[in-house]
Amino acid sequence: DEISEEDIETYYNKNEKNFILPTPIIKAVFFILPKNAPNLKEVKKWFKSDKANDQESLEDYCLTHAKKYDKFNNKWIEVKYILNLIPGDFNTLEKEILVVKNIEKEDDDNYYFLKINEMRHEQTLAPLDYVRDEITLILKNKKKLQFENDLEKQINEEGVRKKYVKIY
């Protein structure tokens, strides 16, 4: 039994208080380049740009040269998972991320780039697409429980009707 999009949205809207974010989430692009990677000046230009062709160039470049390349443009991810991959003090980075959309850091071997496209702060309502799977699971479990309760009720009623069962 499939859960409809309408059912999901209705549940979400009626239960917003249950979907408050405990931690910030982002949609972003994250990559790590070795210090000796070619054309770093060009990469930094693409990184700062919002033009589609620059973003394509950046993606092509990263697929070839990056030690790690993650594109979370269509999927929300908790900030802490990305911040753990970037050198520096976690709390300082977490504060910086609230203000700056493009973060560049380095250590002895690598450059770290994080380009934030969308962000939701903690203690705000989670976006529906972030909690959709959770809501679907809740609604499926509710349907299953309702089915089990209805089945038990039917069995009891039939048992009483056919005098297999006496309820005291």
Locations of regions flagged by a protein language model:
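Peptidyl-prolyl cis-trans isomerase
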Residues: 1-168
